[in-house]
Regions:
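Low-complexity, intrinsically disordered transcriptional activation domains enriched in glutamine
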Residues: 17-21, 35-38, 69-70
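A generic structural signal for tightly packed, nonpolar segments enriched in small/aliphatic residues
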Residues: 321-632
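Ala/Thr-enriched low-complexity intrinsically disordered regions
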Residues: 17-26, 44-48, 74, 79-82, ...
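Intrinsically disordered, low-complexity terminal segments enriched in Ser/Thr
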Residues: 9-23, 30-31
Length: 632
């Protein structure tokens, strides 16, 4: 496509071009010229100009804009220097270019929580519900149908007998579901109440390593029970209040929230009409506090799923920075710091900087994002719990290029950081609402980079230095996740001096060989902490299973002639997942270890995505449950 000389000149000096066909933006302004999106880069370093995205209806309007204004003021400084020299950013400001699209605009919320735990409530009676779904174990459902007086008023006797017969026939070891056509029903206000009733029965028998709530069964039957796109209400029943978290977790992850599919019309009004209404969820038998906590977990799982599903055109390092700062703003009272390439190198975080240096040449700089939440009544000087997440926005493998079709889907390589951001927001929100008690500060570190291939990419045989001051000889640029985590765990242990350090990552394919697609593989330096993590996995539905922790067996895998260690193993048949965790642990501060610091590594490469490739939000429930238990 030919462009005017003016466009070429201006683009060369001031603009960053990115192909993009969508013109909607959460910020309402988009640059689109001949289907080409232009990002204006304003101001010198430290100036009051940052990127802004502007919409032009034609080439002529673009030309007039260029003549009229060579730089675009985009508000306040995106960052300020703190007394320690770190780059600090708040939730309203940005350290890089704005995106033409924000992934949250493509999110359709799936769950909306109702304060009533009854099948029918005054609020619900005002709405049109085509389907009413009940999910639970047989005994819990029988109790609900017997004691909920609103059912007798709204469901006829014939339908109730069909429901009872189905519950009696349900198998103990397997989930099952059915849909009963009831026809149009009207309440006293002549509003349609329900036309179908769906029953989802959860298994009552599970193995000892599984979640006793039967949440895995809910995922199997969720689509058939309540996923038909109709306006619907879902009532979840349980005899154990502790089960609601895992059941809501499972229900949420069954319905992806992100989509960029066209609606078949450019009319926003028609688009709006085609969006399905969210499911209204009621938790029968749950306290108000439990319902609030379940809602927070559901929203956090949706956030993590959306981030994983968003393409790297939007969810690049800057997109992840934007998501983190937006979460901080939603919670309120959260302090934030963001290091980009220059600050990372200045402060000795050589591993994150190295992994992201190729993408940096194209403007996609790596980042270390720090969010700090101090609960009410807790001193900021108290030792925190630290969460460290791997956030590789896209992984090509670098010069150790992924081949044989293994690269598609690598947008999900930031699943650990996404889940930790969701968990951080849920914990902070629950602490503020009083549904979870936090007795110490909570720190989140998102180690973000794009592992790109290019002339600026790190090479095998390069030697880099981590924040711990240890040198690493690269023998596999596709083993980059452990590199970014190395800087994160070192900072969390050495600088933050956390009591407990948890890192989470889609780290190794070997994890799936070891523990499969439903369990994460965990490595821990403390027996009690490991057992607690397994317990919390069962409570939350985010199952976790221990892998060996044995430095004396695994450290030799990283021997190097020229550096403190290599970054990948010599013997790929020697417990690769444990070895990868060992590499991360080698960068945890030695003095912190000697003083009894507790470390947990969660490799969730398998459970982070469904077989379809969509994100599951795995890790949110596990972390919320684990941090809550640590504060009891």
């Amino acid at each position: 496509m030919r462009r005017s000389r003016l466009e070429k000149s201006y683009k060369k000096r001031h603009l960053h071009a990115r192909a993009h066909t969508h013109t909607r933006s959460a910020r309402g302004v988009v640059v689109v010229v001949q289907e080409q999106q232009y990002m204006l880069r304003g101001g010198a370093a430290g100036g009051a100009f940052s990127s802004v995205v502007v919409s032009f209806s034609s080439r002529s309007s673009f030309s007039r804009f260029v003549h009229h204004r060579r730089r675009v003021r985009a508000g306040k400084h995106f960052a300020t220097k703190t007394s320690s020299g770190l780059m600090s950013a708040n939730a309203n400001n940005h350290g890089g270019r704005y995106h033409a699209t924000s992934s949250d605009q493509f999110q359709t919320p799936t769950l909306k929580f109702d304060n009533s735990s009854k099948a029918f409530s005054d609020d619900v009676g005002q709405q049109l519900f085509d389907r009413l779904s009940f999910i639970g174990k047989p005994k819990a459902l029988e109790t609900l149908f017997r004691e909920d007086e609103t059912l007798a008023k709204n469901v006829d006797e014939k339908t109730m007998k069909l429901i009872e017969a189905f519950l009696e026939s349900a198998k103990k070891e397997k989930a099952s579901s059915t849909v009963i056509q009831t026809g149009t029903r009207e309440n006293e206000k002549k509003k349609t109440v329900v036309q179908e009733i769906a029953i989802g029965v959860l298994p009552t028998q599970v193995s000892r390593h599984n979640d006793a709530s039967g949440a895995h069964g809910l995922q199997e039957i969720a689509k058939g029970t309540c996923g038909d796109g109709k306006t619907r209400r879902v009532v979840i029943a349980s005899e154990n209040e502790s089960d609601f978290g895992s059941l809501v977790n499972a229900l949420t992850r069954a319905f992806p929230v992100f989509s960029m599919k066209s609606k078949g019309s450019s009319s926003s009004e028609k688009e709006e009409e085609t969006k399905p209404e969210p499911m209204v969820v009621a938790l029968s038998g749950a306290s108000e506090a439990t319902s609030k906590k379940a809602k927070a977990i559901s929203e956090a799982v949706e956030l993590a799923c959306r981030m994983v599903d968003t393409p790297p055109t939007s969810m690049d390092p800057q997109g992840m920075v934007d998501e983190a700062l937006a979460a901080a703003k939603r919670v309120g009272g959260v302090k934030s710091q963001v290091w980009r390439d220059k600050e990372l190198r200045r402060d000795g975080m050589g591993c994150i900087a190295a992994v992201g240096q190729s993408a940096s040449t194209d403007g996609r700089e790596p980042a270390l994002i720090r969010l700090t939440f101090v609960p009410k009544g807790v001193k900021a000087s108290e030792r925190p719990i630290a969460l460290v997440g791997k956030g590789i926005s896209f992984d090509t493998g670098g010069l150790s290029l992924k081949v044989g079709g293994s690269m598609p889907g690598m947008k999900a390589d930031m699943g650990g950081a996404a889940a930790m951001l969701g968990a951080f927001e849920a914990l902070a929100k629950c602490s503020t609402e009083g549904t979870i008690t936090l007795k110490q500060p909570l720190e989140l570190l998102m180690c973000v980079a794009e592992n790109a291939i290019g002339s600026g990419a790190i090479r095998n045989d390069d030697v880099i230095t981590s924040y711990a001051g240890k040198t690493v000889e690269l023998n596999n640029t596709d083993a980059e996740g452990r590199l970014v985590l190395a800087d994160g765990v070192s900072y969390a242990s050495k600088t933050l001096n956390a009591t407990h350090l948890i890192d989470m990552a889609t780290l190794t394919g070997a994890q799936m060989v070891a523990t499969g697609s439903k369990f994460s593989g965990i490595v821990c330096n403390d027996d009690d902490f490991e057992l607690l993590a397994v317990k919390c996995g069962k409570v939350s539905g985010d199952l976790a299973h221990p892998l060996p922790f044995a430095p004396e067996f695994f450290n030799s895998e990283f021997d190097s002639k020229v550096a403190d260690m290599k970054n990948s193993v010599k013997n790929r048949a020697n417990a690769q997942s444990s070895c990868a965790a060992q590499f991360v642990y080698n960068h945890v501060d030695d003095e912190w270890k000697e003083k009894g610091g507790k470390w947990l590594h969660v490799d969730m490469a398998g459970p982070s995505t469904h077989d379809s490739g969509r994100g599951t939000g795995y890790g949110v429930g596990l972390l919320v449950s684990l941090v809550e238990e640590l504060n009891k």
